[in-house]
Amino acid sequence: MKAVILIPARLDSSRLEKKMLADLQGEPLIVRTWRQALKSRLADRVVVATDNDEIASVLQAYGAEVVMTSPHARCGTERIAEAAKSIEGDIYVNLQGDEPLISPENIDLALEPFFTETPPDCSTLVFPLLPEDFRQLEDINTVKVVMDNAGYALYFSRSPIPYQRQISTSTECYRHIGLYAFRADVLHAFASLAPSMLELAESLEQLRLLENGYRIRCVKTTRDAPGVNTYEDLELVRQLLRNAPVQ
């Protein structure tokens, strides 16, 4: 069973210009993400998929393996599906390029279900939200998820789910961490599907899988780290690195 981490990286970003090349203690953000991916125990290979020559040149100077892709990908999963056509693997991990503090243990948590007798179509990670995290529940940039009793996703939304008619501390709420692992056949099938109605409504690519009958296994984790979507996120990551450098 060969597992490959694919990191989609594009230069254009609507909320933070050229964020993939933003400086983090002397290294570009995308390089930090790549270095964390290399620490995975279960992955056999790490490749960055980009359509940008500048990103490719920067990464190659650090020794990273890079695959050039079309600029027409509609989402990160489509970009890695294109890259996967030329990269042999049984499982592909979609690790967002803007996750410079990603825990290697989280990557392995997402991969572990595939090394069982009944590997899922896809897996992803979820993090528990506590009652005091109500701001995240209301934040449209925080994606929430509800699951069935077997741990498979029922729905992902930017809205607070489940809706709590009566506030109860016994109601479990989870935030989605945007890291996915796919069986090879499922990844290639995803790329052949048109964007779905709910995917377009929520701007959440994983809903394309749910709407087409695929199941997403949600793995709970207690490890969390901020991604970088805004300038405020970037400053937070810089502060965290100053206080506790990632080894």
Curated annotation (Swiss-Prot):
Purpose: Activates KDO (a required 8-carbon sugar) for incorporation into bacterial lipopolysaccharide in Gram-negative bacteria.
Keyword terms of this UniProt record: Cytoplasm, Lipopolysaccharide biosynthesis, Nucleotidyltransferase, Transferase
EC number: 2.7.7.38
Pfam hit, one: CTP_transf_3
GO biological process terms, semicolon-separated: CMP-keto-3-deoxy-D-manno-octulosonic acid biosynthetic process; lipopolysaccharide biosynthetic process
Catalysis performed (reactions): 3-deoxy-alpha-D-manno-oct-2-ulosonate + CTP = CMP-3-deoxy-beta-D-manno-octulosonate + diphosphate
CC terms in the record's Gene Ontology section: cytosol
Top-level lineage group: Bacteria
Subcellular location: Cytoplasm
Source organism phylogeny: Bacteria, Pseudomonadati, Chlorobiota, Chlorobiia, Chlorobiales
PANTHER family found in the cross-reference section: 3-DEOXY-MANNO-OCTULOSONATE CYTIDYLYLTRANSFERASE (PTHR42866), 3-DEOXY-MANNO-OCTULOSONATE CYTIDYLYLTRANSFERASE, MITOCHONDRIAL (PTHR42866:SF2)
Main location per the UniProt record: cytoplasm
Protein known as: 3-deoxy-manno-octulosonate cytidylyltransferase
Signal sequence residues: none
GO molecular function: 3-deoxy-manno-octulosonate cytidylyltransferase activity
Pathway: Nucleotide-sugar biosynthesis; CMP-3-deoxy-D-manno-octulosonate biosynthesis; CMP-3-deoxy-D-manno-octulosonate from 3-deoxy-D-manno-octulosonate and CTP: step 1/1; Bacterial outer membrane biogenesis; lipopolysaccharide biosynthesis
